[in-house]
């Protein structure tokens, strides 16, 4: 008795491959509005913002990214602004 091997449809394989590539590469995210850019991004961006280095005790910080996803600008922020 010969067993037939089930073959996946080429379309299913193509869709799965595209989904895997999308998940690995990640979607291009749009950064939040940077209302308080304070300079180039550094590892101490968050600490500098919340410690008052820039003249105000901000509540949080994030980096604004370029089109390649690299952090470029340190953005301090007030949560309820």
Swiss-Prot record:
GO cellular component, one term: extracellular region
Cysteines paired by S-S bonds: 34-63, 45-74, 49-76
GO biological process: one example: defense response to fungus
Keywords: Antimicrobial, Disulfide bond, Fungicide, Plant defense, Secreted, Signal
Signal sequence coordinates: 1-32
Top-level taxon of origin: Eukaryota
Presence of the UniProt keyword Protease in the record: no
Compartments reported by the entry: Secreted
Main location: secreted
Family statement drawn from the similarity comment of this UniProt entry: Belongs to the DEFL family.
Name of this chain's protein: Defensin-like protein 313
């Amino acid at each position: 008795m010969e067993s037939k091997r089930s073959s996946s449809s080429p379309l299913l394989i193509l869709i799965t491959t595209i989904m895997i590539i999308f998940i690995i590469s990640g979607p291009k995210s749009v950064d939040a509005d940077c209302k308080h850019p304070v300079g180039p991004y550094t590892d101490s961006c968050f600490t500098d913002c919340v410690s008052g280095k820039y003249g105000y005790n901000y509540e949080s910080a994030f980096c604004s990214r370029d089109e390649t996803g690299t952090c470029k600008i340190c953005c301090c922020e007030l949560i309820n602004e």
